[in-house]
Amino acid sequence: MKNLIVSLAVVVTASLNPVLAHATDSDPRAEKVFSEKFAGAQNIKWTRLDDGYLRVSFVLNGVGAESYFDRDAALVGTVRNLFYGQLPLSVIQTIANKFGETCVIEAKEITNEDGTSYKVIFEQKERKYSVRLSSLGEVMDVQKEKIKK
């Protein structure tokens, strides 16, 4: 349960508006961990969030990503932007089999202590879906809302 909460916290925090962020400072301990784990990262921007967590946005090998550090400067998770075709085949097949034809808006890879999962946001007919899947293509969570026109 704790792992699920941490996973959800990373996803929710990743979608927080920059308005919730304040001083763009970092922690030297987190900077050290970051530089070891993400050597070669560019366009690095540190932001301290209202909950005390640090978010670092960066580009690594041409791919945008964000990592999150807790108050003790421990890395709690990383969210990486992907193209739909970069998702594991099992994830793509599950979406195709369960939802049929979709218009994918966003695909993200979430890595934390629980492992790797994927969040795919897509539209279908008059609904917008946010689906979280395991690396094996198992659906972990589905949220849907009606598209207002």
Identify the role of each PLM range.
Residues H22-K149:
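Interaction-mediating elements
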Residues M1-S26, F34:
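Bacterial Sec-dependent N-terminal signal peptides
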